[in-house]
Regions:
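Short conserved micro-motifs at the rims of enzyme active sites and ligand-binding pockets
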Residues: 181-183, 219-223, 272-273
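Short hinge/gating elements
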Residues: 57-65, 155, 213-218, 242-246, ...
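Conserved beta-strand segments of the P-loop GTPase G domain that flank and frequently precede/overlap
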Residues: 171-173, 209-211, 234
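Short, charged alpha-helical interaction segments and adjacent helix-coil junctions
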Residues: 2-51, 120-125, 233-332
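Accessory alpha/beta interaction modules
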Residues: 1-206
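Charged, alpha-helix-enriched surfaces in structured cytosolic catalytic cores
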Residues: 69-73, 131, 226, 251, ...
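Extended serine/threonine-enriched, polar tracts that run as long, contiguous segments within proteins
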Residues: 196-229
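Short, solvent-exposed polar/charged micro-motifs at secondary-structure junctions
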Residues: 97-104, 219-221, 255-256
Length: 332
């Protein structure tokens, strides 16, 4: 399987060619030698096409989907997801916007303003957070507040709440939380608020949750049935055989892969991107383990509290029974 993608993308180099370049340049050699053997193999597999590139990792995603350079790509993906024509007006800064440590498991995060003024946040979590709805709601509210402050500052006395536009939160999961696996036939879950009477009140916040691991399984079993599924497979699947299936079914994706593998010819750049991803992965995994352990501790506390309450209730019941027994004894 090592050279399958080289048949599709002849610019891919051999393993020896990549190793020769690394050995010839001290900076590359120094970085390479800090990696574990498994990491070295993974890097070489990417550069040679033995496996595909993970498109969702921030560096590759932004190289391919950069809205300032190729806005039509992200526009098409968003249009298919939102089921409406989308045109990106500009990219918004999101530095420092993430609440608390919410960036700990993100591998990609971008905020764009659409032509109609609405805001779309597109993010991917490597491992899905616990409480995905609650977390998404908090960050969506933060984006809504940022928009309010920005628009109010621009409009001044002419400001109207009608000037505030929708905020879309589009969340991809590389490894989705367990609750999504209760719905194995669905790879998109759309949520928006509505009233119980049917009266239409615009509450501005909409959410899309996209478990890519489930999308991969569906497309592997049922085939790539439409353009949206083609985009999801492009994002989700780095297996050479699935990349071949995608390019055969939708030849327009060949150009995108060619751009990715052109990046891979720049060993220093890819090595820097790869090192950054490894650093983030290590930090993210530690944070995830801390979060999981804290959740377990919290759950145990609740169980202990419940046991304490049950013991207290039993003590009260025993005391009541002893009191009844004493009363009965007095009657004898």
């Amino acid at each position: 399987m090592a050279n399958t993608l080289q048949l599709y993308f002849p610019m891919l180099r051999t393993r020896q060619q990549v190793l020769d370049e690394i050995e010839a340049k001290e900076k590359l050699r120094t970085t390479y030698n800090t990696w574990e053997e498994e990491e070295k193999k993974y890097f070489l597999d990417i550069c040679t096409g033995a496996r595909g590139v993970k498109m969702l990792y921030d560096g590759f995603f932004k190289a391919i989907f950069d809205p300032d350079v190729k806005p039509e790509r992200l526009e098409e993906l968003l249009s298919l997801l939102l089921n409406q024509k989308v045109k990106i007006l500009k990219v918004l800064p999101n530095d420092g916007a993430r609440i608390a440590d919410e960036s700990s498991l993100l591998i990609m995060d971008i905020v764009v303003q659409l032509e109609d003024g609405s805001i779309a946040n597109v993010e991917c979590q490597k491992i899905g957070y616990a409480f995905p709805g609650e977390r998404a709601a908090c960050y969506s509210s933060d984006l809504l507040l940022r928009q309010y402050k920005r628009v109010r500052g621009l409009k001044g006395k002419k400001f109207s709440y009608k000037d505030i536009k929708k905020v879309y939160s589009i969340i991809f999961y590389e490894k989705s939380p367990s609750l999504f696996h209760d719905f194995p036939e669905h790879y998109i879950h759309q949520s928006k608020q509505q009233t119980d009477t049917g009266i239409e009140i615009e509450l501005l916040q909409e959410f899309l949750f996209i478990p890519l691991d489930i999308a991969k399984t569906i497309c592997e079993n049922k085939g790539i049935r439409n353009k949206l599924e083609a985009w999801l497979m492009f994002l989700a699947d780095d297996r050479p055989e699935m990349i071949q299936r995608l390019v055969d079914a939708y030849p327009e994706f060949r150009l995108l892969y060619e751009e990715v593998y052109a990046i891979c010819l720049n060993t220093e750049r890819v090595m820097e991107m790869f090192s950054k991803e490894l650093l983030e992965l290590d930090r993210n995994t530690v944070q995830y383990m801390i979060d999981e352990m804290q959740d377990e501790i919290d759950a145990q506390k609740v169980q202990l509290q419940e046991k304490d309450i049950m013991l207290q209730e039993k003590d009260l019941e025993n005391a009541r029974l002893r009191e009844e027994i004493e009363k009965l004894k007095k009657k004898i």
